Amino acid sequence: VGFKAGVKEYKLTYYTPEYETKDTDILAAFRVTPQPGVPPEEAGAAVAAESSTGTWTTVWTDGLTSLDRYKGRCYHIEPVPGETDQYICYVAYPLDLFEEGSVTNMFTSIVGNVFGFKALRALRLEDLRIPTAYIKTFQGPPHGIQVERDKLNKYGRPLLGCTIKPKLGLSAKNYGRAVYECLRGGLDFTKDDENVNSQPFMRWRDRFLFCAEALYKAQAETGEIKGHYLNATAGTCEEMMKRAVFARELGVPIIMHDYLTGGFTANTSLAHYCRDNGLLLHIHRAMHAVIDRQKNHGMHFRVLAKALRMSGGDHIHAGTVVGKLEGDRDITLGFVDLLRDDFIEKDRSRGIYFTQDWVSLPGVIPVASGGIHVWHMPALTEIFGDDSVLQFGGGTLGHPWGNAPGAVANRVALEACVKARNEGRDLAAEGNAIIREASKWSPELAAACEVWKEIKFEFKAVDTLD
């Protein structure tokens, strides 16, 4: 018989340097740190095997299928410059290994058991190339950037948001009041914090009602369309959908979901509901740093961002480059492009390992949030451009005169930066001067400038390119 029992080296089956990748393959770039004594070919082949058809020993049932058709293949290995014993292993997966339209299934295979594999000291998924054939099985973002602008009637500038603080402990009525003050002052959006769900001090239904009242009042007073990201995240999918339905009945424009803690299955269901019912969907990435912050193990955020674009969301938090949370500039701009653009060229200097064509899947607006204030406005406008949401939580609510003046200060600073940019001025070089000029005719901005003139979050990023 052709069956030969026993353990054989992975590389004999799964390391295929001569393989030419197909347009329909899902391609993955792994950063592999093998255990001492394990050659890189064996480590790369082990990753390909354990994340596709392989197991630790030859099995009789291998003969009942065509491994050549279904196996993952490690087709290229390169050492990581400046690191000893660390390699980038490229793996190609045949499309048939994955259920259509399921980010959950894709991740279960590609980043499943293999990450606990003993022959590896550490493993990190750096990037994925999603083939067009697979992308076409996903709905993607409920609406996308252009439709959102049309719904909100806001063009030619970044949008402004604010997370309501203190994040936990306010009653629904006081929470709604804070929302109203911010929106009336000139912000486009306010936001539930990611951990505001339905707690004893503020149940979700009360919050939804008071926030809806606040945004309609602010809308009437300012003549601008306003939104509040109502967090629909809940303990069960059914409860989450119930909250989304209630938000739709209130007629609000946007709801929110924590997509990593809530899970991709729940997120995809919610995104489908949002498209069917005209709701925008704001996505918060709570838990991402558990997965993506370590340089040699886990999964890079650009992979989580691609997965979100497939699963569906209209906004996603994407770091600030200048605030209090982790984020290297080139890397951040790399995945910001992956979220917004239709076609992204391979560019290793920005951490992009593969050329990605999104075949007209709608884009996602990146949200800059975390420790930013008016002095950061020129840098943020320059780094993120118009298609972004800039969120100032403490940077609005921490204003010495209150929420509405805090909102005014941010709006004045933003309009000044956009005007200066449109006149051809260099925001990077002249940013401080632009803010100072604007503060001369805005007492609210002048007060904000005074409060935050010394605040900096100067720490080196942990996850850098080199």
Curated annotation (Swiss-Prot):
GO-annotated biological processes: photorespiration; reductive pentose-phosphate cycle
Pfam families reported in the protein's UniProt record: RuBisCO_large, RuBisCO_large_N
Key words of the record: Calvin cycle, Carbon dioxide fixation, Chloroplast, Disulfide bond, Lyase, Magnesium, Metal-binding, Methylation, Monooxygenase, Oxidoreductase, Photorespiration, Photosynthesis, Plastid
Highest taxon listed in the record's lineage: Eukaryota
Modifications made to the protein after synthesis: The disulfide bond which can form in the large chain dimeric partners within the hexadecamer appears to be associated with oxidative stress and protein turnover.
Cofactor note: Binds 1 Mg(2+) ion per subunit.
Residues engaged in binding Mg(2+): 191, 193-194
Residue positions, PTM N6,N6,N6-trimethyllysine: 4
Catalytic activity: 2 (2R)-3-phosphoglycerate + 2 H(+) = D-ribulose 1,5-bisphosphate + CO2 + H2O; D-ribulose 1,5-bisphosphate + O2 = 2-phosphoglycolate + (2R)-3-phosphoglycerate + 2 H(+)
Catalytic site: 165, 284
Subcellular location: Plastid, Chloroplast
Cofactor: Mg(2+)
A single GO molecular function term of this UniProt record: magnesium ion binding
Site (described: Transition state stabilizer): 324
Gene3D superfamilies reported in the protein's UniProt record: Ribulose bisphosphate carboxylase, large subunit, C-terminal domain (3.20.20.110), RuBisCO large subunit, N-terminal domain (3.30.70.150)
EC class: lyase
Principal place of residence: plastid
Residues that bind substrate: 113, 163, 167, 285, 317, 369
Quaternary data: Heterohexadecamer of 8 large chains and 8 small chains; disulfide-linked. The disulfide link is formed within the large subunit homodimers.
Function: RuBisCO catalyzes two reactions: the carboxylation of D-ribulose 1,5-bisphosphate, the primary event in carbon dioxide fixation, as well as the oxidative fragmentation of the pentose substrate in the photorespiration process. Both reactions occur simultaneously and in competition at the same active site.
PANTHER family: RIBULOSE BISPHOSPHATE CARBOXYLASE, RIBULOSE BISPHOSPHATE CARBOXYLASE LARGE CHAIN
Family as reported in the entry's similarity comment: Belongs to the RuBisCO large chain family. Type I subfamily.
Protein's name according to its UniProt entry: Ribulose bisphosphate carboxylase large chain
Source organism per UniProt: Uncarina grandidieri
Top-level taxonomy: Eukaryota, Viridiplantae, Streptophyta, Embryophyta, Tracheophyta
Primary gene name: rbcL
